[in-house]
Amino acid sequence: MSAEYFERLERGLREEMEIARRARSKGLDPETDVEIPIAVDLAERVEKLVSIPGVAERIREFEVQGLSREEAALAIGRDFAEGRLGKGASRLDAIDMAIRTSVALLTEGVVAAPIEGIARVGLGKNDDGSEYLKVYYAGPIRSAGGTAQALSVLVADYVRRSMGIAPYKPTDEEIERYVEEIGLYKRLQHLQYTPSDDEIRTIIRNCPVCIDGEPTEEEEVSGYRDLPRVETNRVRGGIALVSAEGIALKRPKIKKHVSKLGIDGWGWLDVLGGEKKDGGGSSGKFLRDLIAGRPVFSHPSRPGGFRLRYGRSRNTGLAAAGINPATMMVLNQFLAPGTQIKVEQPGKAAAVAPVSSIEGPTVRLTNGDVVRIDDPSSFPWISSPEALRRNISKIIDLGEILVSFGDFMENNRPLAPASYTFEWWAEEFRRAGGDPAGMEHVDGRTAIRLSRDFGVPLHPDHTYLWHDITLDELDLLADAASDGEIDGDALLMDMREDVKEVLEKLLVHHKVRDGMIVVEDALPLLLCLGVDETGRRWRREDLNADNALSAVNQLSGLVIRARAPTRIGCRMGRPEKSDRREMRPPPHVLFPTGSEGGKSRLVNEAAEHGFIEVVVERRRCPSCGKEGFAFRCECGAHTERVRACLSCGVRADDKCPRCGTETSAATRMRIDVKGTLARALESLGERVDNIRGVMGLTSRDSTPEPLEKGVLRAKHGVFIFKDGTSRYDLTDLPLTHFRPREIGTSVDALLDLGYTHDIHGKPLESDDQILELKVQDVVLCRNAGDWLLRVSKFIDDLLVKFYGLEPYYNAERPEDLIGRLMIGLAPHTSAGVLCRLIGFTRASAGYAHPYFHAAKRRNCDGDEDCVMLLMDALLNFSRSYLPEKRGGKMDAPLVLTTRINPAEVDKEAHNLDLSFIYPLEFYEATLRNANPKDVEGLIDLVSKRLGSEGQYCGFGFTHDTDDIAGGPRNSSYKTLETMIDKMKSQLELAKLIRAVDATDVAERVINSHFLPDLMGNLRAFSRQSVRCVKCNAKYRRPPLSESCPKCGGRLVLTVHEGSVRKYLEVSMKVAEEYGVSSYTRQRLELIQMEIESLFRSDKVKQTGLADFV
């Protein structure tokens, strides 16, 4: 990719930075300069994230020396230990900086784990009086991943040794506390891998560093409580994550680095299990925790399920899988571009992308015909759910699912046997001396002739699923064909249900007419059945075969491949996401209204009270000394925050010199909301009602936003997130190539953006040419364009009316934003990535280059991220607004990456395959379940191109698609109104799909969703609090006054009878209709009895003797 492209992006960034700096210099914001530092590479990103000078230069030196990321992380630790970095720091500070910097390097300087996941380090005393090192981990360490978590402990040990600190020597009680605590955490939260009790004991007994942590859960341990060296009885999530997902799971990686660096004291790793990998084969894990309304599409490896097809389309890879748009339609439109599916293999989940060039579903129509639907336009009724129910009686086969080799490589999953598809046949035909061009579809006679003349297997179009039937069924079908009539190339047989069922299992397309089964183009079928004009040519006892596939190979005299040896089970996960990011309730401005703002937090309502008392930041003017909360004083000077110790009252910028606690500028003061709002409206020349603020501020200093920004946001209907920015969330989908018509951008506009030639080197002239996507360009949902247009109008008003500058965007329609710069940001991270908008699609997803997603440390298995206009972030983001609580700095652009270097993105992108064709040797390797690493040399991967010009361009793909946004616009999970409607559709679909056991689905829905919900609601009703309808205050017990002590408002229950009964009736009905187990029915009956006894009067009516007469 040309340097001109990156220079163009950076030139646009410099232009917007200049405007933002001019605006910020007016002193109307917490700081007088833009608060998002720019980073050009990983080294600079790490340094700016951890704020330690000299780190970037040292990382670059390690890169020159050729050190891997892990080796560099340990070398950084040595630098801190030996004083080359962090000069003048205390022992604990040096250790703290070493661990944070190492974790930042291991996570590409993107995630918040280094600053949020490591709370602090400390020293403790062993029983022998020696000091040991404690590292306090917090919940956000999860975002670092297991390898970084484990290596952080190794770095801590490395630095500990250099500083002469003794190893940790736990007591037996402390060891058992870890065993109990990790087990309890597993019940409360998800763990990728749960070590056995003995493995936990081994880790804690031998780890030379004490893995400590902050309490993250409300639950407390019940056994090993009040231990002298353990500061809390509550569950510490950090210790469970680092011990289980870190050390236990990533043992082989730690061991490798321990051996390479010659660090002693870690030999105990050999007795751990760790790195548990699924060894292939069928697994039903994806069916766990089934949710009502989210259908199962196929049980594990079941005939009729998705057939595995290897390859990558231009909109798949990086965990996204391709499915024919017709399949999406046929499945009651539960699947749409971006919908997450939980899959059997190769990974745990995938996002769905439409690929029209793979096979669609095979269905039985209500008239008995069996057809395959590859093109939805051929069956106009397919887009209507009602018409689907009228026209389809059974979904016999779901069609193909396109999975790339790179996804098997990334998951280290043995290659599953490939389906026999055209691209495999083409490679065999090419090796035999033929030219496969134009032969993707051939008739039966041609298929037989090519097979005989060239000695290649029968063409996939006429290779049926013989492995799905038994020898008895083969015998039955041969008899029926022999008794039938051959009319030219067609076969006519008497209509018999058992014969038709065998044909359906084979996926033989046929019609039912006048009591006859009609198979057109039947010559290959007859050849495989050993039937000709004279009838059947074989007897069962003559066969030397133990299965039908082997038998048809003998009977036909041709090579017949297994058409679909691998089926992939799957169910629906999360629906696709395309929506604005909102806090709850959504505010226009981070300005406190207190209880005076009412339950809607309206600034206008608070202003009616005149003065209100709230906690805000105390600021002082350096010129005139006046104190208040405004950023600019009436005299025109920019004010300064005044921090003081909340305990001692001593004023200090960071920590109290007397007691050492962190200072804050947050002060309870009376503020004139009425006057402030009136001045804001007057200065802007606006009159806006219903400006939503917040109840209170959660940042360290309780810093409020200028009220003028809220006025303008309310005017344009724009809402704000916790850091001052306005965001739009979208499901991630990959895209390496596109057609101009797919993104709604004209050829002229694309030429202006630098898209001058297509992938074949031809000048761009038509909107149907395929172009290679530049790595920092993105294509968004059209709804996102509408939202960004509103934000752009707010920004222009802000520049003109608040900052006194010229408007920047001047946009009247979403297309006017094409070419504008934005920031992409993933949850749990702290580094935004610069990007450019080039178009819109109808799909509810965000398309971007795999590098762009990987730069945010995301893949495309259903993850969702946000985008924001660059100018919005530069003007409105401030660290001063971020919540002070743990995790407050996550999901905030603390640093901005301006140029993507493929070597510095998440390594999953390095396994993206770029070939136009998979070689024949690859398909043959799948038949022996080869390890992906054994065939890595056959496939062109990103990892092989790093450091060359080819790392940015010249990407290939094996399968094209007509439209990257094909299929339904939204999943019906989002469009169906009630949960009952969703579940009804889910169970109807289960009955319709051959690969699904509807009874099992019904049982799983009841057991994993409805029963826990019923029990939880029943428990919640008995423990509920009461709520004030006026101020929303909640009370654990109803006050004796029967009204709100705060405002006198009416109190109501927070859990109602309807909430408890919600799923009872439907659960009983489903249990009866689908014949679930008696155990499940009895559980429902017991809960029904409990609910009835709770809500029905149990008073006994007094009866007399006369009542019985």
Swiss-Prot record:
Gene Ontology terms, MF aspect: DNA binding; DNA-directed DNA polymerase activity; single-stranded DNA 3'-5' DNA exonuclease activity
EC identifiers of the protein: 2.7.7.7, 3.1.11.1
Region feature Disordered, mapped onto this chain: 571-597
Keywords: DNA replication, DNA-binding, DNA-directed DNA polymerase, Exonuclease, Hydrolase, Multifunctional enzyme, Nuclease, Nucleotidyltransferase, Transferase
Family, as annotated: Belongs to the archaeal DNA polymerase II family.
Free-text function comment from the UniProt entry: Possesses two activities: a DNA synthesis (polymerase) and an exonucleolytic activity that degrades single-stranded DNA in the 3'- to 5'-direction. Has a template-primer preference which is characteristic of a replicative DNA polymerase.
Entry protein name: DNA polymerase II large subunit
Organism the protein comes from: Methanothrix thermoacetophila (strain DSM 6194 / JCM 14653 / NBRC 101360 / PT) (Methanosaeta thermophila)
Name of the gene encoding the protein in the UniProt record: polC
